[in-house]
Amino acid sequence: MQNLYTIIVAFSAVLTLSSCSSVDECRKGVTVQNTSVSLEKGMCFGKCPVYSGTILGDGQIMYDGRRFTEREGIYVGALSESKLCELITLLRQADLANQPSEKLDNVPDAPISELRVVFLGKVYTYKWNMGTPDALKRIETFIEDNTHENQSLRLMGN
């Protein structure tokens, strides 16, 4: 029984250390100063939600619900280490430098979305109005899920 306990403790320690090293590897080179992702959803003639969501390189989240959103005001929170690594992995895989910066159709009422990515000190800005470019969909969904849809964020100042 003592041997089983020792094996379990050793296995747990190995898992903990390996997850720490994978998080460290994932975040390699990423700092709050050189990495952030912001998604801004603009107005239309109707009741389109108007908001912005930002995630910094240290996992800090800020959501600003402006109009026609479930929550108006500025909300803050933080990503878990694993969620932050998920975002960093998406950024690494997105081939950001080779994406077109604009995909705007001539539709007057279509709200403009803007994704601004600062990744390892390089700045990328993308705008679209009639459908997210395929290469950016996973990043957009991640930002929406963790800012606009994130009910665990708290109202700033509370």
Segments the model singles out, each with a brief description of its role:
Residues 1-20:
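Sec-dependent bacterial lipoprotein signal peptides
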Residues 4-5, 20-45, 51, 69, ...:
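Short, well-ordered, aromatic-rich surface patches in folded extracellular/luminal domains
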Residues 14-16, 59, 86-87:
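Short hydrophobic/aromatic-rich motifs at helix boundaries and adjacent loops
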Residues 54-82:
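N-terminal, post-signal-peptide region of Sec/Tat-exported proteins
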